[in-house]
């Protein structure tokens, strides 16, 4: 997979020959310095942008063949997102925020029950009916993780999920994601600038100058969830 921005002399190669597979239940870190291409890679995996060349497969589907409407629907059903800031709607309850991605499809009693179960799993049983502006930053990020899981996605993509938290709260969020990966068999792809914060994980991919490395070895790597 390659991504080039611009043309001719102003062209910037943001990603160069990147291709890798992801196993179900794997917790994968993508690390790199600012401008390395890691955010561009996350946008490709998250189907928020299209590669200049190459393909992105998810659950056996070549997503580069989908039109914009198909891609949007596929993204909502197959991917969950967690960002540096929780981005909860302050006038909604924690439960209502968790249900937002599901509302794009349809919210029914089953969805509400699933959301409540997820909130219990992430430790927010007592806060689920609180307004989002009445909970702490760490609790908000837990709610964001539950929101990312509500559609039972193949992959949860997390972009600097601990970047706005103090060290103690960040450690709680790290352990929560690790626990969910094991307990639910949930695949996580996490972009971070600090791989040491996450300790032992299944795999670490380093992005440098748009190229992907596992350890010291450059990898020409298909993005799949199987």
Model regions: which residues?
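ABC family nucleotide-binding domain
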Residues: 1-200, 204-207
